[in-house]
Amino acid sequence: MSAKEVRFGTDARGRMLKGINTLADTVKITLGPKGRNVILDTSYGAPRITKDGVTVAREIELSDRFENVGAQMVKEVASRTNEEAGDGTTTATVLAQAIAKEGMKAVAAGMNPMDLKRGIDRAVAIVIAEIRSMSRPVGDSAEIAKVGALSANGEAAIGRQIADAMAKVGTAGVIKVEENKGLETETEVVEGMQFDRGYLSPYFITHAQKMVVELDDCAILLHEGKLTSLASMVPLLEAVVQAEKQLLVVAEDVEGEALTTLVVNKLRGGLKVAAAKAPGFGDGRAAMLEDLAVLTGAHLISAELGTKLETVTLDMLGFAKKVVLTKDSTILIDSAGDKAAIASRIGQIRNQIEDTTSAYNKEKLQERLARLAGGVAVIRVGGATEIEVKERRDRVEDTLNATRAAVQEGVVPGGGAALIHAGKALAGLKGDNPDQDAGIKIIRRAIQAPLRQIADNAGIDGSVVAGKVIENDSATFGFDAQLETYGDMLQAGIIDPTKVVRIALEDAASIAGLLITTEVIIAHKPERGERMSQMDEMGGMM
């Protein structure tokens, strides 16, 4: 086992706080409409320019192990907020720094860390309850566009594109963000269900110029296993031809004689047909095949379910008015599934989403839900250079996450105003002892930090701005950093998703509470080579 270094008390917290400040000071300059960019050096290719808080935080790794502990803990705030809310990472970082800074000062002054944390937790619960009471639902696409524009640093076009995409595919629909090769940012909406598997052979192509397969009035065979021979389903193929239908075969794989038979039938003109692999892997593949069966009205052919190819009849196939296959994807349009069965399947998946604790499983379930419930929209982000495209893509993804959060829990006045006004509910709140009172005061001060930072980044004294907002009795009064004016945030269209504000405060207080109650840090002792490297970085002063 390698040697370890141990730091106690004030020494440990001081080193940790230095790391916290290094990371937070780097991230918080990106906050607000006049926040600055950060350039990230990359190991290959051009440098990356971003205003995304969690992207900046992930790049920071400090050479001092004890300082790095503090930095990594605050990085965890940004990561957790990003995972839970999808936005608000910079706000969470600013809050965590403010709470940790004030809390460590209080501990150094001799206050009990555990009582401080109890006071902090009590105050946070009150503020969160007040934020929930201030929240109001998102009204329409225009309001969704406002949320999007704000998250995209005032770029209204991005907000409108996301609002339009949501209007078409539904708030539960899949919206993908990709990079475009052109200058423009475009939105393409796919009506129907799409999965990421394309045609198995280019011989199935029906439109050589577009390199796609298009099947109309299409029967769909869903098979859970591999198909290596079609001898047992010749009667079915004949029935499809007699019914003047076209055919899509979806299976774990179609290979050998089975694939050859389908290709020959297509080339001879006897049957317009295509084959694709089933989407997903393992248990996920079986679940997605069942989704496809419900959506298209098909019977899933599976040994486990007791169905065999030789017993399949025409009425066991699914149907869609149109199927489009590229080399990478398959789209089913206007499928013939029973609406009640589809609604029941959607309900099952929603229940599974609520029950699962795995972030990965939740993401996959949400993708399945979206495919069944809404459809698919693709936003292709354009730009003049690769660097610009990547920076814009970051902003579009943040905007998309913010709008989804707004739809889920509603919106509150933006620009840090909601936290300021919710904090007024702490007036007169008392803890069980003076140390808990100090914890409550820490939150009263810390929740001003995002507004102060937004103002500072706009070149205006944050203390003055915070004071004016606190003095006003209106719960919607705030500061518009873009125009450098005061007014009603809701009327100005400056709104934040309630979920983003709530989770940013919860996660910041949670991690900061752990930092405040830390008394000892144990870190790996640097090896000789590392110590020499650190001496070189300090100019060799020893």
From Swiss-Prot:
Main localization, broad class: cytoplasm
Purpose of the protein: Together with its co-chaperonin GroES, plays an essential role in assisting protein folding. The GroEL-GroES system forms a nano-cage that allows encapsulation of the non-native substrate proteins and provides a physical environment optimized to promote and accelerate protein folding.
Oligomer status and interactors: Forms a cylinder of 14 subunits composed of two heptameric rings stacked back-to-back. Interacts with the co-chaperonin GroES.
Cellular-component GO terms for this entry: cytoplasm
Highest rank taxon of the organism: Bacteria
Name of this protein: Chaperonin GroEL 2
Keywords: ATP-binding, Chaperone, Cytoplasm, Isomerase, Nucleotide-binding
Source organism: Cereibacter sphaeroides (strain ATCC 17023 / DSM 158 / JCM 6121 / CCUG 31486 / LMG 2827 / NBRC 12203 / NCIMB 8253 / ATH 2.4.1.)
PANTHER family given in the database record: 60 KDA HEAT SHOCK PROTEIN, MITOCHONDRIAL
UniProt-annotated location(s): Cytoplasm
InterPro entries recorded: Chaperonin_Cpn60_CS, Cpn60/GroEL, Cpn60/GroEL/TCP-1, GroEL-like_apical_dom_sf, GROEL-like_equatorial_sf, TCP-1-like_intermed_sf
Family as reported in the entry's similarity comment: Belongs to the chaperonin (HSP60) family.
Pfam families: Cpn60_TCP1
GO molecular function annotation: ATP binding; ATP-dependent protein folding chaperone; isomerase activity; unfolded protein binding
Residues binding ATP: T30, L31, G32, P33, K51, D87, G88, T89, T90, T91, G415, D496
Principal EC category: isomerase
Catalytic activity of the protein: ATP + H2O + a folded polypeptide = ADP + phosphate + an unfolded polypeptide
GO biological process: protein refolding
The enzyme's E.C. designation: 5.6.1.7
